[in-house]
Swiss-Prot record:
It comes from Homo sapiens (Human). This is Kelch repeat and BTB domain-containing protein 11. SMART domains: BTB (SM00225), Kelch (SM00612). The lineage of its organism: Eukaryota, Metazoa, Chordata, Craniata, Vertebrata. Residues 1-129 are annotated as: Disordered. Kelch repeats lie at residues 311-359, 360-412, 413-455, 458-500. Residues 140-196 form the BTB domain. InterPro entries: BTB/POZ_dom (IPR000210), Kelch-typ_b-propeller (IPR015915), Kelch/BTB_domain_protein (IPR052310), Kelch_1 (IPR006652), SKP1/BTB/POZ_sf (IPR011333). Gene3D superfamilies: Kelch-type beta propeller (2.120.10.80), Potassium Channel Kv1.1, Chain A (3.30.710.10). Residues 12-31, 79-91 have a biased composition (Low complexity). SUPFAM superfamilies: Kelch motif, POZ domain.
Length: 623
């Protein structure tokens, strides 16, 4: 009977030409010479034990150590062949092909290591296991195979955090596909510690994708939160692109949130803004404008009495102006003003103009501090405040230094109108970061004091010695036009646009009239921008809770109402809608006192700005 040939297990002979091997070679049958190698290196194995001569030779080889000149090249292969009955997971790694008859060699790695190298040449890495886990869970009882490497973990830890591992809790060896080795290491560290460390913009996409594949939603959110502070103009678009390719909504929204929070920087960067689609650009701006909740704010600028008549040549009050140069936020629930931020160093606090564009507060021009000659001069500096990051930054300076200017926002541009003894007007394009001249004010318009607002895509400026002239600027034609003037000759406090109307607030009584001659009051008239017609809105009345004397104030529109702010108090004016009965005087509106006065020095300029809410705001979804 011919015996089946077993695979050869070859060793270099200590003496290739040793006596006895040649004699046994001649006595062997053809079935006993199964391979083409020299007969002195082969033996056959049947169902019974091999012939005595071969057994003696094998016993001699086992008892005598191999010579130093010949390394061991082949082991007993029949033991390795028994691995064919193992599962595919056990065959995936060379370490699983251990002989069942031989005890497994103890691992040379410390117990705190999670990773078994696939080959002895590759070193292992320390495990991200917090102290005390070994005592609680014992030795790792799960082997994770990924990218040819093996990681050890505890089934109980992973099953408690993931349905994916809970459904596979019966397996001792688990091959993980679709997740990179780097991502799996970070996810395991997060599963043990609850902290996502080591996430960077260049690997966050694979970490979030791995967390979704392994059903670790908490890890995906922590990875997104961890990479948020690392986003910048240099990497935000790459992160967004990776998130869109892999449909990672959390990461995509984080990139959109960064871009909307830093909208001006993104707008000026062609490598980012130029690669966004039109829908994405609209989404960023929409998120920016709807972020948080709109609040009433007021900037304290310049000392008291320094409104429209302070000349740049006078250096008095510079130090005092800097002391109260801050922005305050009105908290309606508490009825009080609280400081939000202070003007940055280098921003003049007297005679500057301010407005809001893209939910940024811009401050431009003003009276610069006195120079070496002791004379103050107009400033050309421009700064902007970002409420999303609570930070100030410098913007391209004006082409011409200005004080007592009016700064307005219209159709995504800034307009610096006039100034003391100036008729010129310039426009700022935030995307190009450039100021450019536009049509100047008509000659003989007004030298210093004027009010300005925007309505229906046009700029309206009122001024003159008696504040009765009204001019309109059409940006499409780049020209100024004369509008019907108001019949009022009272001292104007401010002018603000709301719902297609321009509301003008006048302090009753002429400039030279004594305050004791009669009660002080405020009259309101409005101009219909389409009908081009003035009409009275509120007859002169005293502000509720206000002082007996006239107090100049400034106005801002917010949530369908107009807020009047001065150092004496804060009032809300609610115009009557069409067809409604009037307010205090029966002519269409009334005043309501709000909170306590703001105890600061200087002129208060109110405006509306959206401040971030907690938790982080943002419009979910994508175009």
């Amino acid at each position: 009977m011919e015996h089946a040939v077993a695979p050869c297990v070859l060793y270099p002979g200590t003496e290739p030409g040793a006596a006895g091997e040649s004699e046994s070679e001649g006595a062997a049958s053809p079935a006993q010479t199964p391979c083409s190698l020299g007969a002195s290196l082969c033996f056959s194995s049947g169902e019974e034990s091999p012939p005595q001569s071969l057994a003696s030779a094998a016993e001699g080889a086992a008892t005598s150590p191999p010579s130093s000149g010949g390394p061991r090249v082949v082991e007993r292969q029949w033991e390795a062949g028994s691995a064919g009955a193992a599962s595919p997971e056990e065959l995936a790694s060379p370490e699983e092909r251990a002989c069942p008859e031989e005890p497994a060699a103890p691992s040379p790695e410390p117990r705190v290591w999670l990773e078994d190298p696939a080959s002895p040449e590759e070193p292992g890495e320390p495990a991200p296991v917090p102290p005390g886990f070994g005592a609680v869970y014992g030795e790792p009882d799960l082997v994770l195979e990924v990218s040819g490497r093996r990681l050890r973990a505890h089934k109980a830890v992973l099953a408690a955090r993931s349905d994916y591992f809970r459904a596979r809790a019966s397996r001792d060896v688990l091959r993980v596909q679709g997740v990179s080795l780097t991502a799996l290491r970070l996810l395991l560290a997060d599963a043990y510690s609850g902290r996502m460390a080591g996430v960077r913009p260049d690997n966050v996409a694979e970490v979030v994708a791995g967390a979704r594949r392994l059903q670790l939603p908490g890890a995906a959110q922590r990875a997104t939160d961890a990479v948020g502070p690392q986003l910048s103009l240099a990497n935000c678009y790459e992160v967004l692109s990776a998130a869109k390719r892999q449909r990672l909504n959390e990461l995509r929204d984080a990139a959109y949130c960064f871009m909307s929070d830093h909208y001006l920087e993104v707008l000026r960067e062609p490598a980012v803004f130029g690669r966004l689609s039109g829908a994405e650009r609209d989404l960023l701006l929409r998120r920016r404008l709807r972020a948080g909740r709109a609040h009433l704010l007021a900037a304290a600028l310049g000392p008291a009495g320094e409104r429209a008549g302070s000349r740049p040549q006078s250096p008095s009050g510079d130090a005092d102006a800097r002391g109260d140069a801050a922005v305050y936020c009105f908290h309606a629930a508490a009825g009080e003003w609280r400081e939000l931020t202070r003007l940055p160093e280098g921003a003049p606090a007297r005679g500057c103009g301010l407005c809001v564009l893209y939910n940024y507060l811009f401050v431009a021009g003003g009276v610069a501090p006195a120079g070496p000659d002791g004379r103050a001069r107009p400033s050309d500096q421009v700064f902007c405040y970002n409420p999303a990051t609570d930070s100030w930054s410098a913007v391209r300076p004006l082409r011409q230094a200005r004080s007592q200017l009016r700064l307005l926002a219209l159709d995504g541009h800034l307009y610096a109108v006039g100034g003391e003894c100036l008729l010129s007007v310039e426009r700022y394009d935030p995307r190009a970061d450039r100021w450019a001249p536009v049509a100047p004010l008509p000659r003989g318009a007004f030298a210093v004091a004027h009010e300005a607002t925007t309505c229906h895509g046009e700029i309206y400026v009122s001024g003159g010695s008696l504040f009765y002239r009204l001019l309109k600027y059409d940006p499409r034609r780049d020209e100024w036009q004369e509008c019907p003037c108001s019949s009022s000759r009272e001292r104007s406090a401010d002018m603000v646009a709301l719902d297609g109307f321009i509301y003008r607030f006048d302090l009753s009584g002429s400039r030279g009239e004594a305050q004791a001659a009669g009660p002080s009051g405020v009259s309101v008239s409005r101009y219909h921008c389409l009908a081009k017609q003035w009409s009275p809105c509120v007859a002169p009345l005293r502000l509720p809770g206000g002082p007996t004397g006239l107090q100049p104030f400034r106005c801002a529109a917010l949530d369908g109402a107009i807020y009047c702010v001065s150092r004496a108090g804060t009032w809300r004016f609610q115009p009557a809608r069409e067809g409604e009965a009037g307010g205090d005087a029966g002519q269409g509106g009334g005043f309501e006192a709000l909170g306590a006065p703001l105890d600061v020095r200087g002129v208060l300029i109110p405006f509306a700005l959206s401040l971030p809410e907690k938790p982080p705001r943002g419009e979910q979804g994508a175009p």
